[in-house]
Amino acid sequence: MQGNREMKRLFVGGLGQGISETDLQNQFGRFGEVSDVEIITRKDDQGNSQKVFAYVNIQITEADLKKCMSILNKTKWKGGTLQIQLAKESFLHRLAQEREDAKAKKEKSTTGNPTLLEKMGAVDFHMKAVPGTEVPGHKNWVVSKFGRVLPVLHLKNQQKHKIMKYDPSKYCHNIKKIPENLTETTPIAELTWELEGGNDPMSKKRRGEFSDFHIPPQKVKKVQKSNDPMESKVSNIGLRTNQVMEKNKSTHPVTAHGTAPSTVNPSKQLLVSSSGTQKPKHVVFHNSDFEIIWNKSSMSDDDVDSEDELKMMIAKEENREKPGHSSVNESEHDTFEVVRDDFKSNIHKLSSSVSLGNNHEYDSSDTDEIIAMKTKNAKVKNSAESSQPERTVSKKSSFQKIEPSNDCIKVQGINSNKESALCHGVKFVNPKFPPDSSGSDSEESEEDEEYKVLMENCPRVSLTLADLEQLAGSHRKFPGKDSETNGPQNDSHCKFDTTSKNPKTSGDLYNGRQQCILPEEIVASLLEDENTYSKQKSEEDILKPKFQAFKGIGCLYAKESVDKTLKENIAFNTGGGHHSSLKHEDHNRSLMENGSKCVNGSSSKLTSCQPAKKVNDPNHIQPPKRQCTFENQNHKVMSSTSCDKGSTNPLPGPLPLKAKTSLHLSANSHKVDSDGDACHWPESRKALEKERTNLSNLESLEKSSKVSPREDPQKSPAGFSLSDSNASCINAKDKQAEDNQKRLAALAAWQKAREVQKKLVHSALANLDGHPEDKKTHIVFASDNESETEETSTQEQSCPEKELMKESVSKSPGKLFDSSDDEDSDSKEDSTRFSIKPQFEGRAGQKLMDLQSQFGSDERFRMDSRFLESDSEDEKKELNEDKVNEDELAAEKKKTLNVVQSVLNINVNNPTNKGSVAAKKFKDIVHYDPTKHDHAIYERKQEDKEKESKATRKKKKEEAEKLPEVSQDMYYNIAADLKEIFQSMSNTDEKEEDVPRTEAGAREGTGKIRNAETLACEPEQTTGFTFSFFDSATKDEKDATYRIELVKHGKIVCPNDPRFQDSSSEEEDIAEEADHSKPSPGEAVPENEAIRFFFFSENDDRLRGSNLFWSGMGGSISRNSWEARTSSLLLECRKKHKEAKRKVKAN
């Protein structure tokens, strides 16, 4: 038994939860040797086990397997029913078996037939004999060297036609035998290339030997400047340092003459990104005291610049920048600089990045160069303006990445007196790169042209000296206001170039006329904390309009953006989502328009932009706001949109059943300070929370009221649930009582839901109508800075006419945010806002409304009651016409009814008058209530049917089977013999012989004419079936029941071959004959009267028409001629086709 065991793989299903491998081994170990057990548990999405089964590998005999299957299969064991069967073979086991079978088959095919070789005396084609001996029994087989048996071949000589005999035993003396165990196969993974070569770097790299990769240190040279900036000298150029500013670490560059190291704040660094492929070798930046030169050394150790080369390059830079130094030195201590009107700028790019590590467009570490600028105070947030002519050469790759800025002049606000005092201290000049070895001039010219094309759409702002002085002085008036305010500040208050990731100047402010002073660059680098700037960038990721807003359009943009932000707030709240920030196209458009230059009046005053300082109070969290300022000649509208980041109380949504809070609009919102905002927000949010809870309760109750008719019968105290098995046992009364209880429960639930719904609606409407005065429903937005409020107040005092205009604008319902001063007037307007005006009522009012809709909402064309037309004459005419039309219609209807009545002999008068017919009224569907006595009429009374006896049922069955009795009364006469009818018809009708339908016969048949007098003189005999609507009038004119008329055939003379009868002369003859053969109007067509049988007879009139479709014997002649003609036509067509082809080829 032990020897017959085989490895079997069993599937064991239906196992319980707590079964282990040892349990299965003990259970199946009785029948064989268990080698492996694999338990598999299938689980659902929640992790609950659904199915447990196992695979058991066991060495077992066939008998033991049958015994195991019969004993254990379908038995309950540890909470499960076992199911045992042979498992499917594992694919790995099957794959190994297939490989072994293929290997054995291959080996078997390579071995030859052993019996044949044994007969030859050779084993595997090897014989122990001297080379040259023939194999016995086999002709042309010879023993070669090493005992191999080879055939003698007859080969053809290549040079001669002679066939030579090739004996392999005579050419085998130089063969060497290679032992089989000499070749050692190495695995593929261990195979390597071995390339011979020297110790030069290329050979080492080919062999895969690379030296350790070291980043060469960046070299910082400090050149002390003399008093004259034109004669700056470089000393100690060989000084190199490895202390390089990296990311957010502050560094201490070593000075040339051992002076104290200058500390540089990492937040005040300026990053200049160059293009990826073209790297500047020398970048020179001018500061107030010294020049810093950064050298990017190459990656290889061999490429190191010598001191002589450095001196030559720096001398070139100094020669290039001599005219630049003079202009910088002259205006070094001024607050601002203005460029001469004859200057033409060709700046390609200046990209300065403040965010370190967050720059997505220029994040390559090997192309960024970090420049430290010396500042006198560590708290400087803003740096100076410079307008020095520069020229930079950039690659086209970086040039295409950077879009031109729409804001050509960027002015950053300065937050303190110290900042404004230090404004002139730092000057910055763009780097100048040395020209490359070849092709730099052509690239410069191409890029100049491309840049001019790109910068054509840039707006050109002309500034005067007075404007710039006023701009510089405006920052000194309000120092440190932003640091004192604790409320949410403006994160992006306007003139940022939002398409590029860093603020940059957009050059080429070239004006063709050059009549005004054009500042080429007024650069203000916003050097704030990188985190703050990156957050601002995420919020300012807004879209640009296609064209820049010009003067006077700011108000239109403001109105559009204000309306759209109101719509977006409502859509945001209906969705119920808690969004962190509003990022959509319309709001971005309004913010971007805020970023455009808004010109107030005729003066070109630029609004300064002040970056907001974030409140560092950890316990104080306020939502960031974005404030948009729109200026026009007449009025200024300020709006702000705020949303809570992650807050649980978003902006108000629409209230249920028209309970919506109206946002009162006013143009004076910029007067209100930020404290008003803090006051009104919590109150409005509490009211909104109440309304939202009411809305949710209402929705839940509506759902419950919809479900209650199905659920309540099951939840009723009686708890009736009828099944099909016992339904027949319950009598009708019990069933009716049960149905009544179900109806009562449904009624109670329905009434309860209706009452709750009414209460909710009532409370919502009460909150809407009786709103207390202290709780304002509208939102008041304050201005961010006190400086702005002061500016607007001074402007309002100086311009009372503008104030009056603002008040008139605020009354129109088109503006978004109003102040709290107009609350009373707005509440009155709300009551009369949706009431229909009296001049628009009635038919004339409808005409007035149509006339008003043509003008739209234009204030100049407001239609009132003065425009109403006098409708007396027109309406009277219309009424008279309607009455006349109705009278005519009634008379015509009466006339037609009389005609129908006289014809059909029936009374068609409408018996019912309009007054007698009761109008159909809609009555509410009565909900049956079993408790009310009035509703007893709706009940269907059940009558108990008595059981019929067998005798009565049998009697009814016999009555149903009886045939119905037919009365013997005769109501009509039946002609017993049909011969009388046919005889009377034969006497009256004249028999005519049918002529065969030929040409002559057809003409004769059509030529027969009978006069009307002879027809009238003929005696009339009754033909049996006659009927007339009018007895006396029509008795004299009785014709036969059926009249046979010959069909006139137009122009076809020969019906057999109509193809050959198509000449014009024949057609004219036929037309004349047909005209002669037409009977006159007073003549009648002769009648063909004959006895008509059911079956067709020979020469029957009814078969005459079908003769047209029969072809006679002459058809074969026409067919032959037609076939001959078609063949000749085909030949001619082919000939013409070939000629046309030849002409086409010749052309």
Curated annotation (Swiss-Prot):
Listed GO CC annotations: nucleolus
Posttranslational mods: Phosphorylated.
Coiled coil: 868-898, 937-963
Subcellular location: Nucleus, Nucleolus
Sites bearing Phosphotyrosine, chain numbering: Y362
Start-end of Basic and acidic residues biased regions: 700-714, 732-741, 799-809, 857-883, 994-1011
Gene3D superfamilies: 3.30.70.330
Alphabetical list of InterPro entries matching this protein: NOP8_RRM, Nucleotide-bd_a/b_plait_sf, RBD_domain_sf, RRM_dom
UniProt cross-link Glycyl lysine isopeptide (Lys-Gly) (interchain with G-Cter in SUMO2), position: K225, K316, K1038
Phosphothreonine: residues bearing it: T367, T777
PROSITE patterns: RRM (PS50102)
Ranges of biased composition (kind: Acidic residues): 441-450
Keywords from the named record: Coiled coil, Isopeptide bond, Nucleus, Phosphoprotein, RNA-binding, rRNA processing, Ubl conjugation
GO MF entries: RNA binding
Region (Disordered): 379-401, 427-452, 472-511, 592-659, 686-741, 766-888, 932-963, 986-1017, 1055-1086
Alphabetical GO biological process terms: cellular response to leukemia inhibitory factor; rRNA processing
Residue numbers carrying Phosphoserine: 300, 306, 364-365, 416, 704, 783, 787, 819-820, 825, 827, 872, 1063-1065, 1080
Physiological role: Plays an essential role in the survival of diffuse-type gastric cancer cells. Acts as a nucleolar anchoring protein for DDX47. May be involved in regulation of gene expression at the post-transcriptional level or in ribosome biogenesis in cancer cells.
Subunit structure: Interacts with the GTP form of RRAGA, RRAGC and RRAGD. Interacts with NIP7. Interacts with DDX18; the interaction is RNA-dependent. Interacts with DDX47; the interaction is RNA-dependent.
Protein name: Nucleolar protein 8
Species: Mus musculus
Gene assigned in the entry: Nol8
